[in-house]
Amino acid sequence: MAIKTYKPTSPGRRAQTCSTFEEITACKPERSLVENLKKSGGRNSNGRITSRNVGGGHKQKYRIIDFRRDKTEIPAKVATIEYDPCRSARIALLNYADGEKRYILAPLSLKVGDTVISSEQADIKPGNALPIRCIPLGTIIHNIELKIGKGAQLARSAGTFAQLMAKEGKYGQVKLPSGEVRMILMDCKATIGQVGNADHENVSIGKAGRSRWLGVRPHVRGVAMNPVDHPHGGGEGRTSGGRHPVTPWGIPTKGYKTRTNKRSTPFIVKKRTK
C-alpha cells in the first residue's frame, strides 16, 4: 500500500492524504458473506448514549469474517483482496478446496493465488493459522484467540502484530502491540504474519467532513462547556478548567490508571507500555 497526496486545490485537500488502494483486486464483495449493518448512533437498547461522538457516516455492508479459522486441514486459495469499510485492515476472500468461501484478514504480503491452510502441521508462512504450541518462538503473529474456539480478539487492526516470546507449561507468552506481555493458552489459534495495510496510520483525514463520512462526530472540549455539562465548564472568559483533567463524570484522566483487577489479571506478565 502507498499513500496518495493531493494538489492543494482547497484547504481540505491541502492536508488530505489517502490510500492508493493498489492492492485491491475486487470492487464488489461476495454476496453470501455480506449482511446489513444497522447504525446505533452510539445508543444502547434503552436509547441512551453509551459511546459519545458516534453517529452518521456512510451506509455500510458488514462482511462476515472468519476469526475462528476452524475449517482445518483443507487448503484454500486466495481469490481476491478487498476493501472492508468496517475495519482498517484489508480482507482476503478464500476459495476452499471443497467449494466453501470465507473472508479472513489479509496479512502483509498475501497475494491473489496464494494458498493458505489452518492446520497443526501448516508451514510458517503468512495467512496460515496454527495453535500457539505449534508456532516457533520469535514468530510474528496476529489474529490471536484469548479463549479456545471463541475466535480471534487480539492484533486485528491494520499493521498490527504480536510476537511469541516464550512457552511455559500450558501457556505461551505473547508480546502484544501495546507492549503488554500476556500468557495465552497453547491451544488458542493465531495466524502467521503481520496484518496488512500497514500505512493506514500515515493517512491524514484532512477535513472534518471526512470524519463525518466515517461516522465520527465532533469532540467538544470540557472547558468550552457550561458547568452543568462538564466539571471543567463555566468561568468568566477562557479558563484552564481550574482542576486536574477529569472526564465528564469526574474520573481523573490523562495518565490516571483506571483498570480494575479482573480474573485475567494474573495472566499479564508485563504491563502495557503504550
From Swiss-Prot:
Q: Does the entry feature the keyword rRNA-binding, yes or no?
A: yes
Entry keyword Chaperone: no
Q: Name one GO biological process term.
A: cytoplasmic translation
Any one GO molecular-function label of the UniProt entry: rRNA binding
Mind listing the UniProt keywords for this protein, alphabetically?
A: Ribonucleoprotein, Ribosomal protein, RNA-binding, rRNA-binding
Q: Where is this region: Disordered?
A: 224-259
InterPro entries noted in UniProt: NA-bd_OB-fold, Rib_uL2_dom2, Ribosomal_uL2, Ribosomal_uL2_bac/org-type, Ribosomal_uL2_C, Ribosomal_uL2_CS, Ribosomal_uL2_dom3, Ribosomal_uL2_RNA-bd_dom
Q: Which Pfam families match?
A: Ribosomal_L2, Ribosomal_L2_C
**Sequence similarity:** Belongs to the universal ribosomal protein uL2 family.
Put simply, this protein is called Large ribosomal subunit protein uL2
Q: Which lineage?
A: Bacteria, Pseudomonadati, Thermodesulfobacteriota, Desulfuromonadia, Geobacterales
